[in-house]
């Protein structure tokens, strides 16, 4: 579901308060104040918040008590304090009936347990997690003080698996399996906080797994030959993987659905189930495993499972990071997916509220990401989805016979009742996709899988209870049975994906799926080059400083592509194409490879999405522009043939050093490695200057240090260093102490990606950065002169209230909800060209010829005081808009074109830089980070920069060289304060 606006914030606030206040009811695992003298015997020690049940109990206090004297408690609260959440007048959760007292003191009774909430669903906004745990069920004779007790386990539903028990539960299933299967259970990597990301493989035998990996290696190089073997029957005894995973473990049933499925296939030879026609079928485990094997990953996010939240320890939603891969968990997950290249992937989620059904399964509505071979996906996607949905629905309470289904339009009993996302979003009456739920973003795991030839599904269960666990378990039974039955067709379909990619071939059948919201094929959705092709022949990423603005990013991309299964080559000689010479050592991505869809999705400029009423998430990926490196598509065939070697081993880049003298050393302000180097130097007490005037061999906005200080960073950073014979005009930077609030993107960017010294107390800061409206103490500090740098639509109200004459406009999106109320939000995004004012803040961008920026939020600065300096405005050129989704952006009256998007204001005791553009969104737009860092450095300038007398003034020019003594800094990702509780989703769509 889309992140909520007003309703979501209110619900989230209620949830947080409920989770933080001391528990008035439960008291955790309660103590009665004295050691119980007797034990209560019970028929079950496990109680559920979402299930009504009766528990037989008995005890003996050593004498015959009076019934009127018996008092009951659960935890440290009497039964009378346990009322379910139905408002002010909730019903008792615990009651006792059928109390019988024998003459010998034997007492028997029935404990009646009602729902903790107002039904059988512990919805995501309800603080059920605070109630789970062990409690003492105690009965006390108030006349004597004697008591009996039993420790009870109280969970949200019976099969719920907390993180602390996940490993032992899986190990127990493996230990007690009865089907003689090969079951491996291994770590595939570590999460940011150091937890194992575990994977279970279930196969007929180990040879199945080994043979598949060998077959996959062959299939990726000669798919036509493998396909011929399948068609002829020469290849018949082979098995293909079905990949099952979860990324949001706060959607609890999604974890337990996998565990219960694993338990079933490990311990039952056959599993009866109902199909979509209400017929009884048999799932024979060994027969199924003759055609498939299972890769089960209970969660990609163990920290979130441990702490009941959506994001990882950094607070990032990993299901918006599958391609950006700023987070370690995303890197682990995608590398494993690329290793196996399964035929299908089921990513299990929850929840959908205010929906027609309690189960929703992809495929998505349009618009579809242009690099997806959608015709191949759709050959089997709908059938595979229905195989899951039919069996899930018919073998749970969530079929057409349910009260919920009847309330939402079901007219017949015992029928499947679920939605296919693509179909649910389409209105036959209007012929439009009235409720789009798209896969335009590259960052969902199932979409990522599609780039690699895997049919990926997001599956949304409806509720947080045992019934949803059962539904998901049976859905997996239905889907895996379908894959086994259709193994050859599915595998041939994947082999066709490989063949098409290896030949860099394009099919007109794909383009039929790229339609408008009115369901009409959109002409030129895949923009074509001069040869009439969408995919280029090559991409070139230079590695020399003359051709590459950020060498560090060039080497980062090599590592990134290798991790994601993209084949990388390197030029062995200089090659000139269209008058441009690409130097030996440049990385080359030949698009004749099976990962060409993914490579192109990462490197191409992006798509302008026109006139859709809604998109689910960011549509712009464009690594060259958002990360900030030079990359050129080459459309001519064969120009690099015989001129490259494989470069599929990660290389460590080196600094690019040019010497013209030894008076001072200039560090080009061209990327994150430069920022990290400067912050490292400042932390060591080294004097660093911010160059205020351009000169020979350096630009305004670069950094300068004394020549003798370069050894302080000589082995760490891939930066461009120029030793010069003069001392550039510069001012000394005071080490920043940046106040950053708890925004996950900001904290990750400033601590992990840029190595700033950050403080949590604004009184200790010498500058503030924020992407959100500041707290009152921060506002007060800024009003008293503390420099402030703000970026994003979220700080504009504060800027308006603080800067005289400042105003802004937001283009709001108003969207009718499919199931709930109208939504109003501001998710428009754009990759666009800008014009810069003369400022230290933008000087390094202007010097590099980097006139492209990105924004998320759909806003402009409409007014500003005369004293302000305009830093950036959107270009007035007709082609300024490069990619994104912003309806009306290219209208004649100019929603964005020519408008101001950043100012600097220093007047009246205020020192504020305001960007209405985003800067740290998803920690992906790192090329824009230096707008913030330049603003910060510019506000902390002191005396003129000077150097010591050592060194020579005479120029000593030398040819530019790369030095083996300067190594690349590792790409940084690790812990920040978590987002906290589970994100609360809107009342409209699925929580992707």
Region spans (language model):
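C-terminal low-complexity, Ser/Thr- and acidic/Pro-rich disordered "stalk" regions positioned immediately N-terminal
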Residues: 945-964
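Bacterial N-terminal signal peptides that target proteins for export
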Residues: 2-14
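Bacterial N-terminal signal peptides
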Residues: 13-22
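A short loop-to-beta-strand scaffold at the N-terminal edge of the catalytic core in hydrolase folds
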Residues: 195-201
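Hydrophobic, small-residue-rich alpha-helical packing segments that form membrane-like cores
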Residues: 276-285, 293-398
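Intrinsic-disorder/low-complexity accessory segments
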Residues: 33-172, 188, 196, 219-252, ...
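Sec-dependent signal peptide cleavage junction
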Residues: 21-34, 959-967, 988
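A cross-kingdom C-terminal cell-surface attachment/processing module
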Residues: 967-989
């Amino acid at each position: 579901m889309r992140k909520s606006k007003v309703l979501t914030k209110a619900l989230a606030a209620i949830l947080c308060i409920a989770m933080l206040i001391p528990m008035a009811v439960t008291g955790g695992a309660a103590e009665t104040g004295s050691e119980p003298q007797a034990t209560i015997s019970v028929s079950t020690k496990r109680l559920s918040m979402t299930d009504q049940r009766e528990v037989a109990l008995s005890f003996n206090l050593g004498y015959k008590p009076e019934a009127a004297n018996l008092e009951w408690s659960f935890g440290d609260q009497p039964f009378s304090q346990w009322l379910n959440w139905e408002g002010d007048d909730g019903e008792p959760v615990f009651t006792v009936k059928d109390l019988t007292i024998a003459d010998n003191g034997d007492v028997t009774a029935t404990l009646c347990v009602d729902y903790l909430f107002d039904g059988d669903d512990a919805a995501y906004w309800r603080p059920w997690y605070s109630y789970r745990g062990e409690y003492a069920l105690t009965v006390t004779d108030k006349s004597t003080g004697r008591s009996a007790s039993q420790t009870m386990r109280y969970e949200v539903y019976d099969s719920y698996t907390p993180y602390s028990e996940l490993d032992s539960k899986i190990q127990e299933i493996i230990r007690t399996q009865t089907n003689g299967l090969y079951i491996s259970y291994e770590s595939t990597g570590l999460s940011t906080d150091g937890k194992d990301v575990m994977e279970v493989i279930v196969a007929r035998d180990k040879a199945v797994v080994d043979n598949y990996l060998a077959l996959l290696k062959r299939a990726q190089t000669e798919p036509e030959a493998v396909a011929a073997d399948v068609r002829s029957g020469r290849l018949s005894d082979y098995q293909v993987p079905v990949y099952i995973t979860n990324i949001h473990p706060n959607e609890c049933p999604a974890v337990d659905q996998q565990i219960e499925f694993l338990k079933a296939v490990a311990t039952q030879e056959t599993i009866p189930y109902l199909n979509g026609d209400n017929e009884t079928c048999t799932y024979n485990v060994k027969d199924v495993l003759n055609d498939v094997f299972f890769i089960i990953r209970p969660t990609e996010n163990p920290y979130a499972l441990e702490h009941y939240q959506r994001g990882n320890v950094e607070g990032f939603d990993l299901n918006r990071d599958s391609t950006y891969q700023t987070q370690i968990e995303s890197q682990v997950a995608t590398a494993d997916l690329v290793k196996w290249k399964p035929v299908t992937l089921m990513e299990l989620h929850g929840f959908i509220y205010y929906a027609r059904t309690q189960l929703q399964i992809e495929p998505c509505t349009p618009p579809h990401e242009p690099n997806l071979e959608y015709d191949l996906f759709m050959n089997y996607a709908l059938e595979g989805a229905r195989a899951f949905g039919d069996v899930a629905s018919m073998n749970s309470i969530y079929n057409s016979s349910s009260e919920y289904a009847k309330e939402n339009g079901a007219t017949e009993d015992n029928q499947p009742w679920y939605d296919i996302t693509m179909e649910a979003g389409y209105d036959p009456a209007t012929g439009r996709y009235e409720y789009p739920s798209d896969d335009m973003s590259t960052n969902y795991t199932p979409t990522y899988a599609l780039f690699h030839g895997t049919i990926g599904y997001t599956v949304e269960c409806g509720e947080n209870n045992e019934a949803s666990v059962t539904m998901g378990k049976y859905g997996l039974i239905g889907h895996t049975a379908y894959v086994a039955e259709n193994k050859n067709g599915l595998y041939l379909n994947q082999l066709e994906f490989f063949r098409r990619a290896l030949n860099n071939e394009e099919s007109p059948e794909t383009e039929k799926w790229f339609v408008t919201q009115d369901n009409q094929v959109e002409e030129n959705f895949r923009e074509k080059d001069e040869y009439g092709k969408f995919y280029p022949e090559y991409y070139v990423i230079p590695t020399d400083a003359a051709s590459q603005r950020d060498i560090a990013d060039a080497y980062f991309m090599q590592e990134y592509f290798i991790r994601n299964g993209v084949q990388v080559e390197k030029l062995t000689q200089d090659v000139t194409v269209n008058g441009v010479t690409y130097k030996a050592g440049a990385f080359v991505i030949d698009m004749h490879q099976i990962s060409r869809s993914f490579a192109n999705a990462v490197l191409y400029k992006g798509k302008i999405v026109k006139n859709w009423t809604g998109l689910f998430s960011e549509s712009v990926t464009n690594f060259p522009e958002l990360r900030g490196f030079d990359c050129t598509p080459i459309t001519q065939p064969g120009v690099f043939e015989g001129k490259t070697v494989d470069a599929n081993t990660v290389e460590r880049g080196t600094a690019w050093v040019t010497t013209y003298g030894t008076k001072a050393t200039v560090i080009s302000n061209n990327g994150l490695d430069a920022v990290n180097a400067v912050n490292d130097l400042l932390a060591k007490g080294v004097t660093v200057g911010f160059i205020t005037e351009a000169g020979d061999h350096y630009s305004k906005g670069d950094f300068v240090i004394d020549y003798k200080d370069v050894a302080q960073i000589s082995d760490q950073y891939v930066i461009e260093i120029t030793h010069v014979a003069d001392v550039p005009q510069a001012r000394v930077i005071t080490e920043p102490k940046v106040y950053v609030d708890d925004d996950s993107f900001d904290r990750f960017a400033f601590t992990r990606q840029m190595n700033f010294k950050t403080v949590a107390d604004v009184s200790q800061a010498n500058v503030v950065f924020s992407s959100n409206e500041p707290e009152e103490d921060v506002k007060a500090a800024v009003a008293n002169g503390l420099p402030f740098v703000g970026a994003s639509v979220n700080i504009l109200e504060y800027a308006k209230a603080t800067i005289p004459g400042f105003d802004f406009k937001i283009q709001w999106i108003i969207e009718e909800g499919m199931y709930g109320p109208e939504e109003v939000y501001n998710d428009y995004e754009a990759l666009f060209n800008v014009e810069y004012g003369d400022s230290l803040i933008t000087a390094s961008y202007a010097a590099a010829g980097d006139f492209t920026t990105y924004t998320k939020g759909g806003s402009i600065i409409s007014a500003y005081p005369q004293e302000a300096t305009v830093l950036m405005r959107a270009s007035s050129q007709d082609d300024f808009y490069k990619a994104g989704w912003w309806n009306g952006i290219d209208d004649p009256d100019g929603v964005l074109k020519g408008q101001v998007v950043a100012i600097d204001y220093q007047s009246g005791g205020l020192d504020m830089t305001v960007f209405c553009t985003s800067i740290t969104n998803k920690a992906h737009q790192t090329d824009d980070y230096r707008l913030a860092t330049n603003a910060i450095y510019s506000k902390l300038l002191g005396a003129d920069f000077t150097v010591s007398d050592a060194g020579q003034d005479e120029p000593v020019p030398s040819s530019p060289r790369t030095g083996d003594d300067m190594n690349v800094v590792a790409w940084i990702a690790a812990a920040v304060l978590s987002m906290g509780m589970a994100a609360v989703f809107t009342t409209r769509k699925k929580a992707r």
